[in-house]
Amino acid sequence: EVPISISTKLIKLLAITRMPFSSASLLPIFLVASYFYSINIETISIVNLCLCSLGVLFAHLSTNMFNDYFDNIDGTDKGNFNYFQQVSGGSRAIELGLISIPKTKSIATLLSLIAIIFGTMTLFSTHNSNIFTVVIITITALLLGYFYTAPPIRLVARNGLGELSIFTVFGPLLILGTSFSIYNGDFLTSNYFIDLLLLSVPVGLLTTNILLINEFPDYEGDLKTGKNHLVATFGKKNSRYIYLFNLVIISLVTFYSATILNPILFLPFLFILIYGTKITIHIF
């Protein structure tokens, strides 16, 4: 038997969990931390920031694997022949023989349990007035992530509900959930709630646009298997305008936030504008 090196195992782990995409869930957390740091570092719990980051990371990896599992079960991945394109969705780890279907489900379940453990640990040092809200947000986010592809709800096939759930999870739920978890005080009644609620809009829409772009190369295969996301519902031509509309809202809200919150936000505004315009030109 040929021994497998640690580096090969690590690459395999990165592939089957789609770990590089976890930046979509970690960057909003760091954005919240940066916001509070610019005000006063003592306003947040560093311990909870670390626990929250780990919990969200494992929850995201678990969701990725559950999505691959259910996409394979319902035949979505088997019907997609464009998976070597850079922006095609899914890891294709099962199709490529990197992991079996039962093992995918087992690891996804294990990662979920680890995420729940970190989430529970966070509650022990969360401000009393924020605990209930953190629990509700966490449960909601986990359910939306799981039922994104899981039957019987399968949000991804509900003509736009999948994209709405992605916006909700990676925008308001993640930004506000992190804030409630790490803020040393009653966050809902604080002066920071509206600021971060506003910031959650471009963050959520940015992730939604990334998802939208991934749906374009999967269009034909997803349509055949009943995965009726926005691109499958409205077609490639019309979906371009959905992407453009989201980009305009992202740019406007980010620009407004930069003018009233912190001028440093002009940097991501410029990045979003330049990169978003590049993609817009490509799809049009």
What does each of the following model-derived ranges do?
Residues 164-219, 237:
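Functional transmembrane core segments of multi-pass inner-membrane proteins
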